[in-house]
Amino acid sequence: MNRAKVLSSYLGLLRTEKKVFQNDKRALEHVINLTRVQFRDNKNETDNTKINEMIDHANAVSHFLVKDLIQGVRKDEKTIQLKFDENTKSYQQYEFVNDQPPQRKKRGKIQIDDEQPTTCCGGGCGKPMPSNNSEKSTCS
């Protein structure tokens, strides 16, 4: 019974991958190879609970690929066309306009007031400035 479930989930996942990645040969080869390796690595598993968890995981991956995956195809340097399927969960057309970050604006020159600071060092200690230059500042 478990063998039939495992084979069914394996073949179903391979069919889903072929359907979803039909136009992306490199991605298709990668996911099929990854699926084969993972199923082959776990072929000697005898624990029924682990086998059922792995079957559920394979079915969840298959469901994710059909319902949630959206592929993008680069049309030119700034345009990517998203490929939606009729099975995709949120089939909406989005148009990204001005998705580049805005250009930084140049600031003008910083103006510094010619006033003398009213505190001793101008640094915010709050102590008054000494009346003549011979006195030392009490700031630490």
Curated annotation (Swiss-Prot):
GO molecular function, one term: protein folding chaperone
CDD domains documented for this protein: Complex1_LYR_LYRM7
Primary location group: mitochondrion
Protein name: Complex III assembly factor LYRM7
Region spans: Disordered: 93-140
Functional note: Assembly factor required for Rieske Fe-S protein UQCRFS1 incorporation into the cytochrome b-c1 (CIII) complex. Functions as a chaperone, binding to this subunit within the mitochondrial matrix and stabilizing it prior to its translocation and insertion into the late CIII dimeric intermediate within the mitochondrial inner membrane.
Family: Belongs to the complex I LYR family.
Taxonomic superkingdom: Eukaryota
Keyword terms of this UniProt record: Chaperone, Mitochondrion
Compositional bias segments (type: Polar residues): 130-140
Subcellular location: Mitochondrion matrix
GO BP term (any one): mitochondrial respiratory chain complex III assembly
Pfam families per record: Complex1_LYR
Oligomeric and partner information: Interacts with UQCRFS1.
GO cellular component: mitochondrial matrix
Keyword Chaperone: yes
